[in-house]
């Protein structure tokens, strides 16, 4: 981003930060961890992006005590907190209540619970659940003196999760097409659906571009990708608006991924104060069978 707004100016300049997961460690370790961070010159600590199940262990029942203590421990060492929304990891109880949250792959199979990013950007159930947890976290910590800025979610689209082919996604895709083309004749002309007799009589006839005998219409596929990108932007905007309401003046960022082009980063970043990206010093070398001397160059 070239735009620098007043919120972003608050955190301009190089600062050393770290990701920290207090929920993973015995509380007896937190104070020493924070002291060592300070001694190493760390200024900012990112927390809570994967902690939904600890923040809300049961529907509507929040456990803030541990997170309050973790933030206070970091603040006692003069460390600024980067507070995250925990929406990259919907908990099991939420999936069991609303299985429509799970995304559907291009093979038509539902992608299951058990890792992360197991949600569909177009799921109404997940959109509302995300609003609720963002409201809860932002209202709790929006004015906390240790919270320097915010991060929405975590690495949108990682693990091929931008595009879903669910019924909910198809419904919203049809609405997106109506807004884009106005009437079905305009879509038929733009897509050139006269080819192979693929003309549509209404937007309701249009499905996801998968499962066809041979390759799906390229315009159909392209618009589905554009739609999916807009769904990411819509979802991020919802979170940003909630955070701004409860934490005005504090910068909001998202951690994008390098060389990832599955959605429009500029459109998503347009609602943020800071566009950040995740730097992995070793890249994916730990997953590759390179010789040690090759890895040493990195």
Locate each region found by the language model.
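Polysaccharide-binding and catalytic clefts of secreted carbohydrate-active enzymes
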Residues: 107-296
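Low-complexity, Gly/Pro
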Residues: 1, 7-10, 35, 81-83, ...
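Aromatic-lined substrate-binding rim segments of carbohydrate-active enzymes
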Residues: 31-39, 43-112, 134-138, 235-246
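Short, solvent-exposed turn/loop segments enriched in Gly/Ser/Thr/Pro and often Arg
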Residues: 21-23, 48-51, 84-93, 148-157, ...
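Alpha-helical scaffolding within the catalytic cores
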Residues: 2-5, 28-35, 66-69, 137, ...
């Amino acid at each position: 981003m070239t735009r620098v707004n007043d919120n972003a100016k608050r955190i301009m300049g190089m600062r050393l930060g770290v990701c920290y997961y207090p929920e993973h460690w015995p509380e007896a370790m937190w104070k020493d961890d924070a002291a060592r961070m300070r001694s190493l010159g760390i200024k900012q600590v990112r927390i809570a992006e994967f902690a939904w199940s600890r923040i809300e262990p049961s529907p509507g029942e929040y456990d803030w005590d541990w997170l309050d203590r973790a933030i206070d421990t970091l603040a006692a060492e003069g460390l600024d907190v980067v507070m995250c929304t925990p929406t990259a990891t919907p908990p099991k109880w939420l999936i069991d209540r609303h299985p429509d949250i799970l995304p559907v792959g291009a093979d038509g199979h539902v992608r299951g619970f058990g890792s992360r990013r197991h949600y569909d950007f177009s799921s109404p159930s997940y959109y509302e659940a995300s609003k609720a947890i963002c409201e809860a976290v932002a209202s709790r910590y929006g004015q906390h003196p240790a919270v320097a800025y915010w991060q929405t979610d975590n690495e949108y689209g990682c693990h091929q999760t931008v595009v879903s082919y669910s019924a909910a996604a198809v419904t919203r895709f049809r609405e997106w097409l109506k807004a884009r083309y106005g009437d079905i004749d305009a879509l038929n002309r733009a897509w050139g659906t006269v080819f192979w007799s693929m003309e549509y009589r209404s937007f309701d006839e249009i499905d996801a571009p998968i499962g066809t005998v041979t390759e799906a219409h390229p315009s159909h596929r392209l618009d589905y990708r554009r739609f999916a990108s807009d769904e990411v932007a819509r979802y991020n905007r919802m979170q940003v608006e909630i955070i701004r309401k409860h934490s005005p003046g504090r910068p909001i960022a998202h951690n994008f991924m390098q060389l990832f082009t599955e959605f429009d980063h500029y459109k998503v970043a347009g609602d943020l104060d800071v566009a950040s990206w995740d730097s992995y010093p070793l890249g994916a070398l730990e997953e590759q069978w390179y010789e040690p001397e090759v890895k040493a160059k990195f």
